[in-house]
Amino acid sequence: MPEPIRSDNLSSPSGPSASDEEDSPADYIVDINCNVPAWQKWASPLEAWVQASMQALRMPPGEISLYLTDDADCAVYNERFRGRTGPTNVLSFPVPRPDGDALHGPRLWGDILLSYETITREAAEQGKDFEAHLVHLLVHGLLHLQGFDHENDAEAAIMESHEISALAQLGFANPYRLDEEHA
């Protein structure tokens, strides 16, 4: 299992200090597979958001695949891999990493699947900007690729704190505060 990031490894909401060594966006490779026309206009912005999110989370350089799809396709993956009926907003499929540091080259992090219809519907229902909700789900998916989960309250609190910190670095508000306002 990949070693998760730690809160002391995240930069502060104001960004990294000048002494921190930064990976450049070129160190993060994003392969985008888009089978839904509604996603087309988001392909380039998504690539940039994924790279910026990986930097904000201080992920080591590597590659991810982003699969932009719809509810029908997402429901198939959700049933097959999670045993849950119906679509969801984001699914993450981490690539297992062999023990040791003997691997060379960029790390293969895994795949993230995003469902346009569910994300659009959730953003409208929760009174959120589509792009803000989308970037939140990207960060959420990237944390799953690093081994984070939210199966219980303690895990969820840790994951949410990383999401809030990364989103603040990217210029987005705390998405959970917005959820509380619309509850």
Language-model segments: residues:
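An acidic/histidine-cluster motif and surrounding catalytic segment
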Residues: M1-L134, Q146-A183
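Short active-site segment of divalent metal-dependent hydrolases/proteases
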Residues: V139, L143-H144
